[in-house]
Regions:
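Flavin-dependent oxidoreductase catalytic cores
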Residues: 1-270
């Protein structure tokens, strides 16, 4: 089973990834980190500050998967090329973000309103790039039943892994992830599938693995922020000790203070 840390804007940056890997990375539960989404610039001029988050030297020892938020397939393919030049193999496409500021622009899960545009986007990406490209998605915009047509579309492309968050766009993060809908559509997925949504305890993660043994991976988000030893515990390891938590939080505090130049900003981030 592959384990992933979900991309969360303002939380899972390079400083957090390094601290988590150092204090809670475990050989028995190796984790790959999705970086918070990057939007390809329309003028194709890369912003150094944003790219610094993905510089290989800024992420030593922490396996990272960059994520793109875009709606232009040709532009996304260009950005994938830039990331591959940095040494990244897999790149993820974000078709799942439900934030209003994102969906209003027709990006993230907002793309799911128009499957013809999703088709054109994916064609623009896969016709111009080679190598592993994964997708993170929601079930639809207003109803889980929309996923039947969405999945049929995804199956036309060589997606290396499909991460499904079983909520619809309109839910944002309210209510519960629709595990029944996920179970309904999982047998029809032709590509490897990763589950994401409402995994906050080791017991929940182990139960999910037992219920869906054919998953290629499990992605945890808020759960791994609240309990950084979650994955380690899920494979039989120890909970976070007081010493580990103190060292982990001290590293975050000092690293953020150095990055922001102010201790108050570090505390706000934490």
């Amino acid at each position: 089973m592959n384990y992933y840390a979900a991309p969360m804007e303002g939380l899972t940056d390079r400083i957090w990834r390094q601290a988590h890997q150092r204090w809670f990375g475990a050989p028995e539960a190796p984790v790959r980190y999705y970086a918070p989404f990057l939007s390809p610039p329309e003028n194709r001029v890369l912003i150094k500050k944003k790219m610094a988050e993905l510089a290989p030297e800024a992420n030593p020892g922490a396996p990272v998967i960059p994520q793109l938020l875009a709606k232009d397939g040709e532009l996304a393919a260009w950005m994938i090329g830039q990331l591959r030049a940095l040494g990244y193999t897999e790149v993820n496409l974000n078709l799942g973000c439900p934030a209003g500021t994102v969906t209003a622009k027709g990006k993230g899960s907002g793309m799911l309103r128009d499957l013809a545009k999703v088709d054109a986007f994916l064609d623009g990406v896969f016709s111009r790039t080679e190598g592993p490209v994964s997708v993170k998605t929601r079930l639809g915009v207003t109803s889980p039943e929309e996923f039947e047509a969405i999945l049929d579309l995804y199956d036309r492309y060589p997606i290396c892994e499909l991460t499904v968050h079983p909520r619809v766009m309109r839910q944002l993060y309210r209510g519960e992830a629709d595990r029944a809908a996920f179970a309904k559509y999982l047998p029809h997925c032709r590509m490897p599938v990763c589950y994401n949504g409402d995994i906050t305890t080791p017991a929940q993660l182990k139960a999910l693995e037992a219920e869906f043994p054919n998953l290629s991976g499990i992605m945890v988000g808020r759960g791994i922020i609240a309990d950084p030893a979650l994955l380690r515990q899920a494979v039989g390891g120890a909970p976070a000790s007081k010493e580990e938590l103190r060292g982990y939080l001290d590293e975050l505090y000092h690293s953020y203070t150095e990055s922001f130049g102010m201790a108050s900003c570090a505390v706000s981030r934490m």
